[in-house]
Amino acid sequence: MHRLQVVLGHLAGRPESSSALQAAPCSAGFLQASASDVVVVHGRRTPIGRASRGCFKDTTPDELLSAVLTAVLQDVKLKPEQLGDISVGNVLQPGAGAIMARIAQFLSGIPETVPLSTVNRQCSSGLQAVANIAGGIRNGSYDIGMACGVESMTLSQRGNHGNISSRLLENEKARDCLIPMGITSENVAERFGVSRQKQDAFALASQQKAASAQSRGCFHAEIVPVTTTVLNDKGDKKTITVSQDEGVRPSTTMQGLAKLKPAFKDGGSTTAGNSSQVSDGAAAVLLARRSKAEELGLPILGVLRSYAVVGVPPDVMGIGPAYAIPAALQKAGLTVNDIDIFEINEAFASQAVYCVEKLGIPAEKVNPLGGAIALGHPLGCTGARQVVTLLNELKRRGRRAYGVVSMCIGTGMGAAAVFEYPGN
């Protein structure tokens, strides 16, 4: 029941994607560099904590956000006043975290002259923040901006849909927007034949990949250690420094996963083990116009090549990436075969398996360091976290390559973005 209330914003009709100018690949298969490119300069994230019982259960979201804002600026030695705008993805904090995010800005030493907004597109909020900042750069509003995502699922009011018209009872799609996310996962599994065995196998792979990545130090470059305090049952405070994700379970086995009962529906196949974790965390991504980055001597970690959002039926919202990814690839002039890494959010194994199979993506290209089933899914943070993880992994590999970030979105949508790593 707890998961039924807290697993939000995830998950066959054919959605239409908007038309866009096609980018033309160069003869080597990569897009031509341009002074007007929107580039990713740098990105950092906090460790991801388990909501309500983990390392950040007593840490406010403004502190999590401040930690990554401060780290990104310090890492590249950028003066805070040089930021043209800040966009913060958030889902569950009051007012989409508008006040909380502005407080975090000031806690990070960023002056009041730098504007800030928050955005809530549910589980794609962090990626939408990236798109919003990129849009401001493209339209000439500024040359440098910060895109962030943050969520404290511990310190949030869940299960409150607010004031909604009674007319939703007359409209099937409107009613479907209130279907619990776990039930949408069951709908995907039943409608598209995703077995419990496949879901558990996908979940096991996520845990194994994350455990391997953690043991090899693959997350060190992206994680900002956070010093905070936790309270025990007696109210005593203890200061701790958190430097790695809490949700990774190296001892996970198929046998253990098979013992878990369905979390949302009698006879169902979605369990706590093959669903994303309820989590706390934050991430920040610094973007700039290529010409400005070069002028200031800033590094270029990646290039944003395209972004797309599509709509899908709300009752199977988890299929969103299966339609958003082709739309983003089309805008970039690329195909599935051109992509080295797909960071697809693991809201539920059911929908992730469906999307991977629908698009024919080789398993080795999907979430090579694990995903939300193992790492956790702080709703507003996830999209920004995925960008940071993707580009750091491409950097580790060292060669020029493309990667995709994608996720499903509660109420029936999917989002995807294509990034290029320029090579060492």
Swiss-Prot record:
It catalyses: an acyl-CoA + acetyl-CoA = a 3-oxoacyl-CoA + CoA; 2 acetyl-CoA = acetoacetyl-CoA + CoA; hexanoyl-CoA + acetyl-CoA = 3-oxooctanoyl-CoA + CoA; tetradecanoyl-CoA + acetyl-CoA = 3-oxohexadecanoyl-CoA + CoA. InterPro entries: Thiolase, Thiolase-like, Thiolase-like_sf_Thiolase, Thiolase_acyl_enz_int_AS, Thiolase_AS, Thiolase_C, Thiolase_CS, Thiolase_N. The active site is at C123 (acyl-thioester intermediate), C408 (proton donor/acceptor). Its main location: other. The keyword RNA-binding does not apply. Pathway: Lipid metabolism; peroxisomal fatty acid beta-oxidation. One of its GO terms (biological process) is fatty acid derivative biosynthetic process. Mainly expressed in liver; weaker levels in kidney, intestine and white adipose tissue. Residues 1-26 form a transit peptide. The modification N6-acetyllysine is found at K173, K234. Belongs to the thiolase-like superfamily. Thiolase family. This is 3-ketoacyl-CoA thiolase B, peroxisomal. It comes from Mus musculus.
